[in-house]
Swiss-Prot record:
GO terms for biological process: valyl-tRNA aminoacylation. Keywords: Aminoacyl-tRNA synthetase, ATP-binding, Coiled coil, Cytoplasm, Ligase, Nucleotide-binding, Protein biosynthesis. Residues 955-1020 form a coiled coil. Its main location: cytoplasm. Belongs to the class-I aminoacyl-tRNA synthetase family. ValS type 1 subfamily. It is found in: Cytoplasm. A motif ('HIGH' region) lies at residues 45-55. This is Valine--tRNA ligase.
Length: 1020
C-alpha cells in the first residue's frame, strides 16, 4: 500500500498513543535488557492545572531522555503524578460552589467540603494527564501518583495504583517532630488576607506599583533637643540646626501603631547624641502617646532618606530581624482578614503596658502577642482605611515633614517652580514606584504577619544537602545553579510548613491541657493516628483521667475542653480531657518534598524503591530550585539518608519570541495544545529540544515551530521517495551497517555520516545538550540525507546497473531506518508512523534497539573525501549563481584552470551528477581564467563561471550598492543605540537582546553584500 502524500498528525497521534498504551510500551521496565536503571520523576503539575508552554518544554526533555534510555535497554521508569495544590484547589472548589449556588465552604463544614473537593478532583483532575499524553509523554501512566493519595475520603479516582502518599507524609512529620526537627512557634510569614493563610515566597508576586512614601516627625521624649548636623562628602557642614524630633519615612503609615523602636546606623554621627533616648510615636490619643527607644543596628542605610528607620517587627521582614537582634517587642496590629485588630483591652490600658516594656520591663512573647496597640477609634477598620486616618491625624497635629509645593519628589502633584503657590509649604509625600507584594491567586496585597505556625528547623537538616552538592554526589546543571543553591541553603531560615486551609494533609497533632498549668497552656501529642494520639495522652494524663476526642474548632482558638474535680484542700485534679486536633494542613511543598520516595511506596520496603531509588535526573525550572529541589534534598537525606537524584538539570522560563515573559495581560501567551493542533506534537517537541541550550534563554516562536513542521514534511517526503523507489520491498534485505559493504562512494559516505551523527546524538544527550542533539539530527536528516544523499543516489537507483541499484536500496533502507530510530526520542509520532508503514517490524519503534555502531568502524576516508569534494563544488557553484542572480533553470558553462588528480577522478566519476545539480552545461579547460569569470573554490581545483554575458553587471552592482546604503543606515541606528549606556542599562532586557540580534543579522547581511560586490568586481 502506497504512502499518503502527507502526514495527518491529528489522526496519527491519537491512534499511535492508543497503540503504545495497549502495548504497555511505557510501563516500568518495558524493553529492559540490562541491569542499570534510569528513573526520572515528573515535577508533579497541580491537579488544577492545564498544560502550558513550560510544562510542554520540561516534559519534552524528560521524554527524550526516557525514550532514549528505554531504547538502550535500561530498566526505565518515568514516574507521573500530580500535586494536590492546596490553596489552588480549595480556591477552585469554592469558586465552583459559588457559581453553582451551593452552600459555601463555611456553611458546609470541613468534612462535607472535603467531599466536594474529592468529587471535583475526580471530575477535573485528569485534564493535564490527557494533555501530556497528547504531547507524547511516555510516563508509566498505570502508576499515576497523587500527593493526597490515601488521605481520608480518597475515592482513588485517577490515581488508582498510587502508593499511599498520605501515610508517608504523616510518618515523616511524626518522625521529624520526635527528632526535634519540627516545632511550632511564632514567626513572621507571608499572610494572604483573602484566603486567611500563610503562603510561600513563591506564591507572592512582587509588582511595581505607583506608591507613596510619607515623611513624619517622631518628637523626642520630654521635649529634648539635639544639634542635627549634615556634612558633605568632604566633611564640610552643609546643615546645622536644633531639632526636637527624628524623622522617618514609611510607605505603610498604619504600621506605625506597632513600632517598637527607631533604628539608625551605628556610624551615623547625625543621631549619635540621641541614641538610647526615647522618642514619641506621633499617632494615637495624645494622653496615651507611646514612647519607643532610638537604637543602633547595621540595617539602616544612612544615605537613604533620613537614615532613620521605624522598626515594626510584627509587620516587616527586615524589621523582624532587627527586632530579634535588639530584643524589641513585636506588636501585632491586624487580624487574619487584614483588618485592624478589635480584640483585647482598651487602648489606654494596652498602651500603658507597652510603655512599661519600652522603659525596660521584662516581657514574654505571649504577653506581647495579646497586646492590641490599635487606638479604639481605628479598631476593626480595613488596613488601608486605617492608613488614611493615621496620615490625616499626624498631618493635622503638625508632625508631617513639610516641603515646598514645587518639590519634584511630590511627583505629578508638584507645581512648576515659579507657578502660583509653588512656594507653599505642604506635607512631604513622595510619589515613587514601590514593589508591592500580591498573592498570586488572591491578587490582594500580602501582609507580613506574626502568627503561630509549624516550622522545619532547616538549619538542622541542611548540612547533608549542602555536602551532597559540594562533594559531587549530586551535580547541578548549569553550574551557575550551584551558586544559587549554596546561597539559599547557607542562609536558610526556618521553613514554615503549616497552612490555614482545609484541603491538604492535616497536621497530625492533637492538643490537650498542660497538666502542670491547667487552662494556661497546651500539651501537644504528635502521632500518626488518633489511636496513637490517644495512647500518648493516656500515658501522659494517667489511668485516672478519661481521654476522648473533640471534633474541634475549625481554627484553634484556645478552646481546649477538660474537666476537673476539687480536692479537700481546694486543689484541682484532672478528671477528663477532650483532645482537639490542629486544624491546619501541611504546605504542599512539604508533601511534594517527599515525591521521590513517596511515589515508590516508601515507607514500605518495595521492589520499586530498590530498583529506582535514588532517581537518575530531575529536570525542572530554576524558579523552584530552593522551594522544591533543595527541600527534596533535605527531606530525602533526613528520612532515608540518601540523595533523591544524581543530577539536577535546571532550565529558564519559556518566553515569547522577543524574550518577554508570557502573560494574559500582554496577550503573548502561546497555548501548546493549539500548537499541537496546528503543527503537530513533533514540531513542538523538536522546537523545544532545539532551544534547550544549557542555561540559555528560551524563546518560543511560531515561525520556529513552522520551520520544524516543515522538517517533518521533509522527512515524510524522503521516506516516501525511498518507498517509491522500492527501498522497503521484501526483495531488499534488512542488513546491519557491517553487512552492507557497498561499493559506491555515495553509499559508503552516507553510512559513515550516519555513524558520526549517532555518536554526536549520544554524546549530546549524555551531557544534557538537547539542542546539540536536535541540531545534529536536523543537519544530518535534512542536509546530508534529504538534500544530498537522496539526490546523489538517484542516478544509481534509476540507472541500469542492477548491482548498484541493489546496494543503494539496501543502504538507503538502513539509512532511513536509522533516521527514524535516532529521531524517535525527539519526534516520536511521525517516526513511529513511518516505522510501521514501511515494513513488517518485530516490534514498535518505541522499543527498537538503539544503535551502537562506531564512526571509527564505518567512516570510509576515500568516500568521504570524494563526496565532500563533489558537494563543495555543487554548493559553491549554487551559492555563486544565487549571489549573481543567475536564473535558476539556466545551464551555464564552467571553466577549470587547474585540478589535481583526486579532483579529476572525483569529477570523472560524478560529472553527470555535478552538471545536473549545479546547472552546468559544459566544462572547458583553460590556462588562465578569462575576463568576465567569477571564481568557484574547490579543494585542489580552480573553477570559474563566465557570467559577463549572462547578467547585467551594472544594474546588479547598482542594486547591491543601494541595498548596502539602506543597510548602513540601519546598522548606524542599531550601533548607536547599543553604544549608548543609558539604553543598555535602562531598556528592558528583551529589547536590548532584540537589538543585539538585529545587529548581528544585519552585519551578516552586510558581509553577504560585500562578498557579492567582490564577485561582481571579478567580472570587470
Amino acid at each position: 500500500m502506497a504512502m499518503e502524500k502527507t502526514f495527518d498528525a491529528a489522526e496519527a497521534e491519537a491512534r499511535i498513543t492508543k497503540a503504545w498504551e495497549e502495548a504497555g510500551a511505557f510501563k516500568a521496565g518495558a524493553n529492559r535488557s540490562r541491569d542499570e536503571s534510569f528513573t526520572i520523576m515528573i515535577p508533579p503539575p497541580n491537579v488544577t492545572g492545564a498544560l502550558h508552554v513550560g510544562h510542554a518544554f520540561n516534559n519534552t526533555l524528560q521524554d527524550i531522555l526516557t525514550r532514549w534510555h528505554r531504547m538502550r535497554g535500561f530498566d526505565t521508569l518515568w514516574q507521573p503524578g500530580q500535586d494536590h495544590a492546596g490553596i489552588a484547589t480549595q480556591m477552585q472548589v469554592e469558586k465552583m460552589l459559588a457559581a453553582t449556588q451551593q452552600p459555601s465552604r463555611r456553611e458546609l463544614g470541613r468534612e462535607e467540603f472535603l467531599k466536594k473537593v474529592w468529587e471535583w478532583k475526580g471530575q477535573y483532575g485528569g485534564t493535564i494527564v490527557e494533555q501530556l499524553k497528547r504531547l507524547g509523554a511516555s510516563c508509566d501512566w498505570s502508576r499515576n501518583a497523587f500527593t493526597m493519595a490515601g488521605a481520608a475520603g480518597d475515592p482513588r479516582t485517577g490515581h488508582e495504583n498510587s502508593p499511599n502518599f498520605h501515610d508517608a507524609v504523616i510518618k515523616v512529620f511524626v518522625d521529624m517532630y520526635n527528632k526535634g526537627l519540627i516545632y511550632r512557634g511564632k514567626r513572621l510569614v507571608n499572610w494572604d488576607p483573602h484566603f486567611e493563610t500563610a503562603i510561600s515566597d513563591l506564591e507572592v508576586e512582587n509588582i511595581e506599583v505607583a506608591g507613596h512614601m510619607w515623611h513624619f516627625k517622631y518628637p523626642l521624649a520630654g521635649g529634648a533637643t539635639y544639634t542635627y548636623v549634615e556634612k558633605d562628602e568632604d566633611g564640610n557642614i552643609v546643615l546645622e540646626e536644633e531639632r526636637d524630633y527624628i524623622s522617618i519615612a514609611t510607605t505603610r503609615p498604619e504600621t506605625m501603631l506597632g513600632d517598637g523602636a527607631v533604628a539608625v546606623h551605628p556610624s551615623d554621627e547625625r543621631y549619635a547624641p540621641i541614641v538610647g533616648k526615647l522618642c514619641e510615636i506621633p499617632v494615637g490619643p495624645k494622653e496615651h502617646r507611646r514612647q519607643i527607644p532610638i537604637i543602633t543596628d547595621e540595617y539602616p542605610d544612612k544615605n537613604f532618606g533620613s537614615g532613620a528607620v521605624k522598626i515594626t517587627g510584627a509587620h516587616d521582614f527586615n524589621d523582624y530581624a532587627v527586632a530579634k537582634r535588639g530584643g524589641i517587642p513585636l506588636y501585632r496590629l491586624m487580624d487574619t482578614r487584614g483588618q485592624m485588630r478589635a480584640d483585647g483591652a482598651p487602648y489606654a490600658a494596652e498602651a500603658g503596658k507597652a510603655q512599661d516594656y519600652a522603659r525596660g520591663r521584662a516581657f514574654t512573647e505571649n504577653e506581647i502577642d495579646v497586646i492590641n496597640l490599635v487606638p479604639d477609634h481605628l479598631r476593626g477598620l480595613d488596613r488601608f482605611e486605617a492608613r488614611a486616618k493615621v496620615v490625616d491625624e499626624i498631618t493635622s497635629e503638625g508632625l508631617a515633614v513639610m516641603t515646598v509645593a514645587s518639590d519634584p519628589r511630590l511627583g505629578t502633584t508638584a507645581l512648576k517652580p515659579g507657578a502660583e503657590g509653588a512656594d507653599a509649604i505642604v506635607p512631604l509625600v513622595e510619589a515613587k514606584p514601590i514593589m508591592q507584594p500580591f498573592g498570586d491567586r488572591s491578587k490582594v496585597v500580602i501582609e507580613p504577619m506574626l502568627t503561630d505556625q509549624w516550622f522545619v528547623d532547616a538549619e538542622k537538616v541542611v548540612g547533608p544537602a549542602l555536602d551532597a552538592v559540594r562533594d559531587g554526589t549530586v551535580k547541578i546543571i548549569p553550574e551557575s545553579g550551584e551558586k544559587t543553591y549554596y546561597h539559599w541553603l547557607e542562609n536558610i531560615e526556618p521553613w514554615c510548613i503549616s497552612r490555614q486551609l482545609w484541603w491538604g494533609h492535616q497536621i497530625p497533632v492533637w492538643y490537650g491541657p498542660n497538666r502542670d498549668d491547667l487552662g494556661a497552656s497546651y500539651k501537644a501529642f504528635c502521632a500518626a493516628s488518633e489511636q496513637d494520639a490517644l495512647l500518648l495522652a493516656q500515658n501522659y494524663y494517667g489511668a485516672n483521667v478519661e481521654v476522648d476526642f473533640d471534633s474541634g474548632p475549625e481554627e484553634l482558638s484556645g478552646g481546649i475542653a477538660f474537666g476537673t474535680i476539687e480536692g479537700p484542700g481546694g486543689q484541682k485534679t484532672l478528671q477528663s480531657v477532650s483532645l482537639t486536633r490542629d486544624p491546619d494542613v501541611l504546605d504542599t511543598w512539604f508533601s511534594s518534598g517527599l515525591w521521590p520516595i513517596g511515589t515508590l511506596g516508601w515507607p514500605e520496603d518495595t521492589d520499586e524503591m530498590r530498583r529506582y531509588f535514588p532517581t537518575s535526573v530531575l529536570i525542572t525550572g530554576f524558579d523552584i530550585l530552593f522551594f522544591w529541589v533543595a527541600r527534596m534534598m533535605m527531606m530525602q537525606l533526613a528520612v532515608v539518608d540518601q540523595v533523591p537524584f544524581h543530577t539536577v538539570y535546571l532550565h529558564q522560563l519559556v518566553r515569547d519570541e522577543k524574550g518577554k515573559k508570557m502573560s494574559k495581560t500582554t496577550g503573548n501567551v502561546i497555548d501548546p495544545l493549539e500548537i499541537v493542533d496546528e503543527f503537530g506534537a513533533d514540531a513542538l517537541r523538536f522546537t523545544n529540544a532545539s532551544m534547550a541550550a544549557i542555561g540559555g534563554v528560551l524563546k518560543l516562536s511560531k515561525e520556529r515551530i513552522t520551520g520544524y513542521r516543515n522538517f517533518t514534511t521533509k522527512l515524510w517526503n524522503a521516506i516516501r521517495f525511498a518507498e517509491m523507489n522500492e527501498v522497503f520491498t521484501d526483495a531488499v534485505p534488512q542488513l546491519s551497517a557491517a553487512e552492507l559493504a557497498p561499493k559506491a562512494a555515495v553509499n559508503r559516505w552516507i553510512i559513515g555520516e550516519t555513524a558520526r551523527v549517532r555518536e554526536e546524538v549520544d554524546a549530546a544527550l549524555d551531557s544534557y545538550r538537547f539542542n546539540d542533539a536536535a541540531n545534529a539530527l536536523y543537519a544530518f536528516v535534512w542536509g546530508k540525507v534529504c538534500d544530498w544523499y537522496v539526490e546523489l543516489s538517484k542516478p544509481l537507483l534509476q540507472g541500469e546497473d542492477t548491482e548498484a541499484q541493489a546496494e543503494t536500496r539496501a543502504t538507503m533502507r538502513w539509512v532511513m531506518d536509522q533516521c527514524l530510530v535516532l529521531l524517535h526520542p525527539i519526534m516520536p509520532f511521525i517516526t513511529e508512523e513511518l516505522w510501521g508503514l514501511t515494513a513488517e517490524r518485530a516490534k514498535m519503534l518505541v522499543h527498537a534497539d538503539w544503535p551502537t555502531y562506531k564512526a571509527a568502524d564505518l567512516v570510509d576516508d576515500a568516500a568521504d573525501r570524494e563526496m565532500n569534494w563533489v558537494i563543495s563544488v555543487i554548493e559553491n557553484t549554487r551559492s555563486a549563481r544565487a549571489q549573481m542572480r543567475v536564473p535558476a533553470g539556466l545551464y551555464v558553462p564552467m571553466i577549470v584552470t587547474e585540478i589535481d588528480d583526486h579532483g579529476q577522478a572525483a569529477w570523472d566519476r560524478n560529472e553527470a551528477l555535478i552538471k545536473r545539480l549545479a546547472r552546468i552545461d559544459s566544462l572547458t579547460k583553460a590556462d588562465a581564467m578569462p575576463k568576465g569569470c567569477i571564481s568557484i573554490a574547490a579543494p585542489g581545483a580552480a573553477f570559474g563561471l563566465p557570467l559577463a554575458e549572462i547578467i547585467d553587471i551594472g544594474a546588479e552592482k547598482d542594486r547591491l550598492e543601494k541595498a548596502k546604503g539602506k543597510l548602513a543606515k540601519e546598522l548606524g541606528g542599531l550601533r548607536g543605540r547599543l553604544n549608548n549606556p543609558k539604553f543598555v542599562e535602562s531598556a528592558p532586557d528583551e529589547v536590548v537582546e532584540e537589538a543585539r540580534e538585529n545587529l548581528a543579522a544585519r552585519e551578516e547581511e552586510e558581509a553577504r553584500l560585500n562578498e557579492a560586490l567582490a564577485r561582481l568586481a571579478e567580472l570587470g
